[in-house]
From Swiss-Prot:
Main location: membrane
Name assigned to this protein: G-protein coupled receptor family C group 6 member A
Entry-listed glycosylation sites: N53, N99, N135, N263, N310, N322, N338, N358, N430, N475, N484, N528, N548, N628
Effect of Y223A: Abolishes L-Lys-affinity and strongly reduces L-Arg-affinity
Length: 877
């Protein structure tokens, strides 16, 4: 930019030194119309200029001056739009009521900065040499405003000179963002939005169509570089990557250099096979050459070309190529209004000798080979009408006309220098003008932002294109007017294929973020949309997912379920046990007076059966979804019921030991201690105390154990110590029972209750000894089943050893269920025991004492447990 400023200073110095050089001498063309207020116009009547040596006057013997070539019909069309707009304004009541007219002086910029500055120099000096016939000088009015130029590059250079005189400049097509900076360009205004809106709209279009791998082509200069900078800024923000950036030379004069750049650009496009969308801010003539180069290459024909306003309506590009050769072209154009009057003006325009005299641009236009006659000239102008450009020019003229009227209402503006350019500039910044019934005004940056139309090119030679969408900067959104766009929507422009749900993108270091590989999400992570940057984590407290998952799944609650086959089997065994208990209880109640029932404990049998019922019922609370209540109830019910059972068995063991104890002293002691219900209550009381402390201090509770795919619901015993005390206490009672029963293991064969108690307690002890390591090492939902199995083994062990033999005698061996059979069995047992003792002591086994008690003469030779007497029947029964 500093280099451009220096060039401008040098150029102004040169221009200041050659004020005497006439326009005719430097081949400068123009169109002039008189008026009270003069407006300057700068339009690209030619597309290029090349410098040639020119012999000047005075101190400058020679210097380089550009000569224009490559006639640009669209530029003439824009100049005619200004002429028509001025004529319409002069005919309006707004100006005619003040008896004012607008005049103009229009010059050709030749699409060249230097040529444009020559024109500005001529516009801003008090005298002009425009009469090519007489070369005479005549005083002219100073210009009050300038309309144009179209190119941002040229507008920037022109604006810097006009800023010095504060002459308002209104461009109808310059969109460079830098021109909105009022601190640098205070006199510049425009009737189009700046490129910041256009690049944002383009990126929004790319984003909406998921085109993330694109290329950009610009023409070198302030406009192109500013547009590329703005475009890249927006793409980075939206995650879109630019695969390549091509900068074509600004000058069109050096065709050899231009062709080299065009061929290099074709190579780049051909190499980037995955880039199917290209955004271009280049000149239309350069795009024409590019398309001609692509036509002969092996380049996919389904590309989408996004055209900036710089060439979006220049359909002369398709003169030698078809859309089928290059793809689809989407063009961004400025929104326009009704320009029917201008089209009619072109039809009515006379292209005779009078027109040639007043307009040198028309004179050259009519000499073009493709024109030939006036009819062709009209058709060519209509074909090259850019509706958006025409409307923008008309708005610029309307704004100036309205501002002039507002200034001249209270002053005589027909007097020269009645108003100054800076006054008009100030008025323009605040003016509100009407066109086609719509009110317009400039914003704080001096811009009028109407938005954009998005057009889709077709092969029709007319300049009209199919408008498919409208873009509104106020809400950064598109409104599509055409729904069927499959040929556009089906185009893919991505560096990498989309990652599917369940995958995420991983970009290698140093690569574009749009070039990546797709990796599967890990376990307990997911991605639920395509092209996810990262995988989201599942809430592992309640959710889970497999690898490569697109969503999280709720964890199911896991517990020892009712419908589990194992649970059904255990519950069936518990139910059978309850049926057995009920049956045995009924049988024992019916035979309550029989010797077998009395010998088995009488009322204690029913108490044992009741306790076993509670133990079987506790199994139910180990199955199903646990709760705090079930966790507490199940252990307490089992603990208390089995304590009651073992306590009753302990009483039975003491009774048997008392009945068959032959040691009189020990027998007397046992008789004093034998208080059945007191013993049962004491044993139960201690267990109740343990359970109460447990439930009070460290009560069991439900615990949720988070597992990879489920949540295990299990009972936490609260205190392993209290749980161990409860079970340990029962084990202690069982050991005592086992000890007592073991001492009476050799009782009468048909009444060996102690042996059955021994087996029952042995089964219980073995089951619970196995339970401890299994319970500690087992985890999962079947932990409750382990305890249930042990409970059932214990219950069935007691049923089998204590009650089934009695039931067998009652039902099948009724002859043993008599007092005589029972006494016979007992006395036989006592006799054999005495004989064994006498044999050990050397006494005659047939000798008897008077009190019917066998006396051992040398008791020290016999162990204490062998010293027996005839049992008392009452203690047994």
């Amino acid at each position: 930019m500093a280099g451009l400023d220096l060039s401008l200073v040098l150029m102004l110095s040169v221009l200041a030194g050659v004020r005497e050089v006439s326009l005719t001498q430097v081949n400068q063309q123009g169109v002039i119309a008189p008026g009270d207020i003069i407006i300057g116009g700068l339009f690209p009547i030619h597309e290029a200029a090349e410098a040639v040596n020119f012999t000047g006057l005075n101190s400058f013997s020679s210097f380089q001056h550009p000569v224009c070539n490559r006639y640009y019909t669209k530029g003439l069309n824009q100049a005619l739009a200004m002429i028509h707009a001025v004529e319409m304004a002069n005919q309006s009541p707004m100006l005619s009521s003040l008896n004012l007219t607008l005049g103009y002086r229009i010059y050709d910029t030749c699409s060249d900065v230097t040529t444009a500055l020559w024109a500005v120099q001529d516009l801003t000096r008090p005298y002009s040499y425009c009469d090519s016939q007489t070369n005479s000088s005549q005083p002219v009015q100073p210009i009050m405003a300038v309309i144009g130029p179209s190119s941002s590059e040229i507008s920037i250079a022109v604006a810097r000179e006009l800023n010095l005189l504060m002459i308002p400049q209104i461009s109808y097509a310059s969109t460079a963002t830098i021109l909105s900076d009022k601190s640098r360009f205070p006199a510049f205004m425009r009737t189009v939005p700046n490129d910041e809106y256009q690049t944002h709209a383009m990126v929004q279009l790319l984003k909406d169509n998921k085109w993330t791998w694109v290329g950009i082509i610009i023409t070198d200069g302030d406009y192109g570089r500013s547009a590329m900078e703005s475009f890249v800024k927006h793409t980075e923000r939206e995650g879109i990557c630019v695969a390549f950036k091509v900068i074509l030379p600004d000058s069109l004069a050096d065709e050899q250099k231009l062709n080299i750049h065009i061929n290099e650009t074709v190579d780049i496009i051909e190499k980037n096979t995955k880039v199917n969308v290209v955004v271009s801010f280049a000149k239309s003539s350069q795009m024409k050459l590019l398309y001609e180069g692509l036509r002969s290459r092996n380049v996919p024909k389904n590309k989408v070309w996004v055209a900036s306003d710089n060439w979006s309506t220049s359909k002369n590009i398709l003169k030698d190529v078809n859309l089928s050769d290059i793809g689809n072209i989407l063009g961004f154009t400025f929104k326009s209004g009704n320009v029917t009057a201008f089209l009619q003006y072109l039809k009515d325009l006379k292209f005779g000798s009078e027109a040639k005299m007043n307009n040198s641009f028309l004179e050259e236009f009519l000499k073009l080979p493709e024109i030939g006659n006036a009819a062709n000239a009209v058709q060519e102008q209509i074909k090259n009408t850019h509706l958006d450009m025409v409307f923008s020019v008309q708005m610029a003229v309307s704004a100036i006309a309205k501002a002039v009227v507002e200034l001249c209402v209270e002053r005589q503006c027909k007097t020269p220098s009645a108003i100054q350019p800076w006054e008009l500039l100030k008025q323009l910044r605040n003016v509100t003008f009407e066109k086609e019934g719509v009110m317009y005004n400039f914003d704080a940056n001096g811009d009028i932002n109407l938005g954009y139309d998005v057009c889709l090119w077709d092969d029709d030679e007319s300049e009209k294109n199919d408008i498919i969408a409208e873009y509104y900067p106020s809400n950064s959104s598109f409104t599509f007017t055409r729904k069927n766009l499959s040929n556009i929507e089906n185009v893919l422009s991505k560096c990498s294929d989309s990652c599917q749900p369940g995958e995420y993108k991983k970009t290698a270091e140093g690569q574009h973020t749009c070039c990546y590989e797709c990796l599967a999400c890990a376990e307990n992570q997911y991605s639920n949309h395509t092209d996810a940057d990262t995988c989201s984590k599942c809430d592992t407290e309640s959710l889970w997912s497999n690898a490569n998952s697109s969503k999280c799944y709720p964890k199911f609650y896991e517990y020892f379920e009712w419908n589990s086959g194992f649970a059904i089997a255990l519950l069936t065994l518990a139910a059978l046990g309850i049926l057995l208990l009920i049956s045995m209880s009924a049988l024992f109640f019916w035979q309550r007076n029989s010797l077998v029932v009395k010998a088995a404990g009488g009322p204690l049998c029913h108490l044992i059966l009741f306790s076993l019922l509670g133990s079987f019922i506790s199994v139910i609370f180990f199955v199903g979804e646990p709760s705090n209540e079930s966790c507490r109830v199940r252990q307490v019910i089992f603990g208390l019921s089995f304590t009651l059972c073992v306590s009753c068995i302990l009483v039975k063991s003491l009774k048997i030991l008392l009945a068959f104890q032959m040691n009189l002293e020990l027998k007397e002691l046992l008789r004093k201690l034998y208080k059945p219900y007191v013993i049962v209550c004491m044993c139960m009381g201690l267990q109740v105390t343990i359970c109460t402390l447990w439930l009070t201090l460290h009560r069991p509770f439900i615990e949720k154990v988070v597992q990879p795919k489920s949540i295990l619901l299990e009972c936490n015993e609260g205190s392993d110590l209290m749980f161990g005390l409860m079970l340990g206490y029962i084990v202690l009672l069982a050991l005592i029972c086992f000890t007592f029963a073991y001492k009476g293991r050799k009782l009468p064969q048909k009444y060996n209750e102690a042996k059955f108690i021994t087996f029952g307690m042995l089964i219980y002890l073995m089951a619970w000894v196995i339970f401890i390591p299994v319970h500690v090492t087992t985890s999962g939902k079947y932990v409750p089943a382990v305890e249930v199995v042990v409970i059932l083994i214990s219950n069935y062990g007691i049923l089998s050893c204590h009650f089934l033999p009695k039931c067998y005698i009652i039902i099948f061996k009724k002859e043993y269920n008599t007092k005589d059979a029972f006494l016979k069995n007992v006395f036989e047992y006592a006799r054999k025991s005495s004989e064994n003792i006498r044999g050990l002591s050397g006494t005659d086994p047939h000798s008897k004492t008077d009190n019917s008690v066998y006396v051992i003469s040398n008791p020290s030779l016999v162990p204490e447990e062998k010293q027996v007497s005839v049992p008392e029947i009452d203690n047994v029964l």
